[in-house]
Amino acid sequence: MSDLTETTAGAMLGLTMSCCRCHDHKTDPLSHADHYRLRAFFAACHYADDVAIDLHADQKAIRNHNQKQDAEIKRVQKSIDEIESTVLARQTVKVEPKKSKELMTSVELAQVAMAESELESLKKGKRPLTNGLLMHDKMDSVQPIFVLFSGDHRTPKDAVEPGFPSVLFPNTPILVKPLKSTTTGRRLTLARWIASRENPWAARVIVNRIWQNYFGNGIVATPNDFGVTGALPSHPELLDYLAMELMDSGWSLKHIHRLIVTSSTYRQQTVADQATHATQATRGGHEFATLRTQLRRKSAEQLRDSILHVSGLLQERAGGPPVWPVLDDATLAANPAVLDDNATKTKGWYPSPPSEQSVRSLYLIQKRTIRIPWMETFDLPENAVSCGKRECSLVAPQSLAMMNGSLSVQAAQRIAETILGDVPSSKNQQIHTAFRQILLRNPNDQEFASCRTFLESRTLVELCLVLLNTNEFAFIE
């Protein structure tokens, strides 16, 4: 409940409520009780993480498939049991079943080994249903919420009702209960207040996140903290203007996106000239950087998707169940909970078939306890906490992953195969095609000469790998 409360406050309101779990906020006008008043909106929530979210037709197909697998598993297991029974029946003295392998002939051992291998393959071939997290209200089981002394559940103090931050809304709100509804209306009341003009935070927080996504820096540099300890807005009038535009347009995100990308600010170059750098030094780095797109590396997801796209490996799809990537043994060993054979979908790890792995990163499963190693190398944040702004590091493992990783190597091989199929004999055309496919431009004279020299002793695959490792490919300009 604390995570839910604090994530809602940070993501939607730009407020840090973690301090208020134990005491009044040290800097912001948020009281100890405000945390628990906000938490009370979720008091009637119940969770279920074993609800199948596949389409009914898909669920039926999965169950039919698993029934066939179970029948085959039963058949193979029966053949193993029969061999063991035959071995035990030959003995003149009673032998424990677990020692039957010691008494088998070489032929019987081979038969059992083959059957056990088939059994393991059949078990791996079973397809689990895709489970989702479901949240719902129960009218008859609303737990009272108490202010906890120092955040300790063993020392409850005063009971509280659902309420918004008291600095803005000191009175207890009237809960909205839909007609003929069996829910409490608490979450609906909170949602309506968040998306209303009575709430001065949500619109600012949303437009600031959109601005940050385009320019690399938000108008407020701390997107999850609009309080006293957070950064001041570099251009408060701009922030309020965009917030008003969002509300006046009926909370249309499309309108804000269009407003930003059609502005002259968005059309500025990423790299500034010498005079502009001098202006930056006099006006302050963040204030200047806010109004110009920053040269920055693509996010982990963007970089992976770009590699798959330029190589032609990307599987275009819209919607569908998540894809479970293949993880190395070291990653799985570091998370023993996912290796439990009896675990449910939310606890285990079930790699999808190789033919389904090259989808957009949007469709890769995300678990709180595990980060995909390749993407973690490129600063994929932890899944357990809300991340307002990603850090961008430059470390050696990133270069190694791009140069030696299976994703980059496989992509370079596919690009080279495609080019050789189109222009098998002309190295000049191969160079131009590689540049156009990977960097979306032709090489200049110096680059072309260097590539010609490179191909005299190296392969086209290696040239494609080099182009995938350029800053021009990995960075957004």
Across the structure, where does each feature detected by a protein language model lie?
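C-terminal or internal capping secondary-structure element at the end of a domain, subdomain, or sheet
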Residues: L465-V466
